[in-house]
């Protein structure tokens, strides 16, 4: 599957430019109001379960939607997903001038494994 290999390379390259944060640290920053968590999964994935207090902006539209929903380029934005999309989204936001962007390591699976809350 060469397409998957190229995708994995793209994700690996993005991760070199993006700071990763643990689910526990992401939860603490969300709960303190220090950060916004952005779920970059598609709406149908979001509807199946998501992090309470997170904002949904799919990977396909985040560049169009981000300024309307998070205008401050200095705000801490933590992207998460179910795979590598959060690293790609975080890198894209950095290129748009957002200065405090993170990708949550392990995505929603790691969040659930840490027994952090989800809702649907």
Residue ranges and their predicted role:
Residues 39:
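N-terminal glycine-rich beta->alpha transition that marks the start or flank
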Residues 1-35, 43-78, 84-120:
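Rhodanese-like catalytic fold shared by cysteine-dependent sulfurtransferases
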């Amino acid at each position: 599957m060469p397409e998957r290999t190229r995708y994995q390379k793209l994700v690996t390259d993005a991760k070199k430019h993006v700071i990763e944060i643990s689910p526990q640290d992401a939860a603490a920053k969300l709960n303190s109001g220090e950060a916004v968590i952005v779920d970059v999964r598609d709406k149908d994935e979001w509807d199946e379960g998501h992090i309470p207090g997170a904002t949904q902006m799919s990977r396909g539209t985040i560049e169009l939607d981000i300024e309307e929903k998070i205008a401050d380029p200095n705000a801490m934005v933590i992207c998460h997903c179910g795979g590598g999309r959060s690293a790609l989204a975080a890198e894209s936001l950095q290129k748009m001038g957002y200065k405090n962007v993170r990708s949550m390591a392990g995505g929603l699976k790691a969040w659930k494994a840490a027994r952090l809350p989800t809702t649907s």
